[in-house]
Amino acid sequence: MLGAVFLLLFWPWTVIGQEKKEAQSLTVFAAASLTVPLQKITTAYTETGAGRVDLSFAASSTLARQIAAGAPCDIFISADRAWMDHLIEEGLITPENRRNLLGNALVMVAPLDSRGESASEDIQPTLNLSPRFGLEGEIMAILGSGRIAMGDPAYVPAGIYGREALMSLGVWMNLRHRLIPTANDRLATVLVERGEAPLGIVYASDSHTSHALRLVAAFPQSSHTPIVYPLGLISDSAAVRDFRDFLFSEKASAIFTGSGFQTIEFLSGNR
């Protein structure tokens, strides 16, 4: 009898506790270029005793379309502002729940060569990317019969930035036929790492965390639209806000900068 009373007294509280724990789990859709740091940050976050965080990585365009189609998601981190703007226009994210999280840069990379130089080391670029006579020929000489791996410029943010940069340098028209367009930036990085492409145009963060690449050149910041990663809340619960705040913490910022990103919380207009 006492055992039955004990169960009646404590069983409901156990269920409530389980429901509370389940309610703390959340889903984050993030640009593929954020894979390495977000996995580390999520591990650090869950070690604090917080709920589970499920991560889904893909091209920002793919994720935005999935969200618009009704895919369950609590936080969206895009690699460009256009797709975040799209979800705001669709009424899925409110302007007050949008905040700029990170910045990035664009670089040209090649497979690690016999000198053992990697893009993550502090080495001098081997190519001067400035609008000048002969630049196209120098790039073609490195390419040989190969192609440039980069995100698809039709919809992948990294590819869109890459197209802007090549157009700014005056070499897009001829190089556009020498591309391997990929579904996201990480795939372009992998193709170069494997030696399947002699050159790649990727984010500086991807080259920073790779030990199989060497830096060929850094694109001038003025050659493309500023690379900004906005964060938006799809749902607005205490657990979602808690993880959002953790992403802006000093611990998370250290992981982001250690992965080659630029933190931009101090920029004006970042809410």
Where are these regions (language model features)?
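Exported/periplasmic ABC-transporter solute-binding proteins
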Residues: 13-61, 65-71, 78-81, 85-271
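Bacterial N-terminal signal peptides
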Residues: 2-12
